[in-house]
Amino acid sequence: MQAPRSCLTQLTLLLVVLLQFLPAQAQARTPEQQTAANMEQARAAGSLALRAFLAGMPKGGDLHNHLSGAVYAETFLRDAATDHVCIDPKALDFVRRGAAPATGSCDTNSVDASTLPQKQSLYDQLVDAFSMRSFVPSSGDSGHDHFFATFDHFTGLSDSHKPEWVDEVAARAAAQNEQYLELMDTPDAAFGIIAQTKPVSSGTGYAAWRQQLLDAGLGQQALAIRQQMDRFEQTRRQQERCGTAQPEPACTVEVRYLYQVLRNMPPPAVFAQIVLGFEVAAADLASTHPHYVGLNLVQPEDAEYSMADYTLHMQMIAALRQFYPHVPVTLHAGELAPGLVPPEGLRFHIRQAIEIAGAQRIGHGVDVMYEDRPYELLKSMAERHILVEINLTSNDVILGIRGKDHPLPLYRRYDVPIALSTDDEGVSRIDLTHEYAMAAETFDLTYPDLKKSARNSIEYSFLPGQSLWRDHDYRRPQTVCATSLNSNQEAVGACAALLTASPKAAQQLELEQRFHRFEHAQQAQQH
C-alpha cells in the first residue's frame, strides 16, 4: 500500500512545480499572440478603445471603393466654391456643369457655392443630401433610395479635381495604416461613348459588334483615357511631393484603378463600355506600370436594366474575355435583399457572375443563401478561391442587412475568402477602421481573423505579378523571401528580384513587415 502513496506524493510535487512555471509560460507569448490579447483587452474596454487599437493595425488594402463615393461631401463643396459652381437650393444639387462660370453668374434661383460659408443652413442641407449624415428612413425615402440619390446631387464637378480626390482617399488610407487602394472609376470619356452608341442589328455577334466599335475609333478613346490617367496620377504625386525629401503620407499608399462600367443602360451602351474598359485595362496591364488593373460593373443591381439584362451582361463579359484573357474581373453581385426584387431575382446573380462571366471576386454577395443550391455555391467559391468583398455598413444602410441576417459568418464557415472594404466611405461617413471594428463587435472577429482579411486584400488584389505565398493560408512563403518575411531587413538577391518583378509580392512583403513592426510594438507595451 505504500507504493501508490509514494507515487501520489511524487505526482503532487510535480504538479506544484509545474504550477509555479505556468505564469512564466503564459507570459511567453509571441508578438502576434500578445497583440491578439491586447485587442481583446481593448474590446473589453469598449468600442472607443477597440477603435483606437484597430486604427493602427495594418489593414493591407481596400478592394471595393468607388472613388466618387469615397470623397466626403465637404470636399465637393469646397471644390464647387473654388469653381463658383451654381447650386439649386431646393433640389440641393449642382446646376452649372462643365467649365467654371465667372463669379456672380448664377441666376436668382441658384446660389454661388463660394457664398456657402455665409449660408450654414444650406451648407448643412447639402452635406446631408450628399451623404447619409443625419439620415432617418421615412415613407418614400429609404436608405437604399437616399444612398443612391446622393450621386446625382454631387455629380457634375470638373474632372480636374480628380487628383485631389484621390489624394484625399489615399491620405485617409495612410492614416489608418492601409497601403493599397483599388479605386473604381468611370472616366469622363466613357460618357461620350455612351452618348454616341447606336443600336446594332439583332444578328450581330459579339465579336463582330466589338470589331465595329474598334473600327469606329474606340481604341483611340482607350488610349486617350490611359493618357489622361497618366496625367492625373502625375499631378497627384506632385501635389503629394512623392519622391522628394518631404513626401506626404499618401505617397506610401499604392493606388490602382478598376474600370467602372455603368450597367443600368440599354445593352448597346453597356457593351460599348465593357469593350472600352477591357481595351483600357488590357493595354495598361501590358505596360510597365499599369493604373487600370481590372473591370467592374456598377449602379444599383435592382435597377430596371441591371435586373432585366443581368444574364445578358454576364454573357457579354464571357464573350469578350477571349479577346482580353489577362484582364481580371470583379463584379457587384448579390447586393440584393428579399422584398427589394421578386424572389426569382435572388436566385442566380452570384453564380452567373462566377460561372458565366468568370469573375475572380464578388462585391457584396449578400443574397448568397437565396441562390439556387447555396451550399453548393459556397463550396464552389471556396474551391475556386473566389474572394467576397464585404461592405458591412453599406449593406446595413442600403439593404437593411446586418447582424444575424448577414452572410459573413457563412462565408467564413465555408472557407470562402473575404476582405473587408468600405464601398463608399464618403457617402456613408465611415472609414476602413470602422468596418474592422464593426466586424469585430458584430461577428466577434479576432485579431488573427482581421489579419487574414488584410492579407487577403493583397493576395486577391489585381496587382500583377507572382504572389509572395505558396498557399492561401499564409504559412508557406516563397523560399527566396523567407528570411525577409518577418523582419525589417531589406530584401536582397533572389527575393529582391521577385519583388522588382512582382508588384503584388512587393506589397505583400510590405504588409508582413508592417505586421512585424506593429506586433513588436504591441508586445513592448506589456513590459
Segments and roles (model prediction):
Residues 10-20:
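Bacterial N-terminal signal peptides
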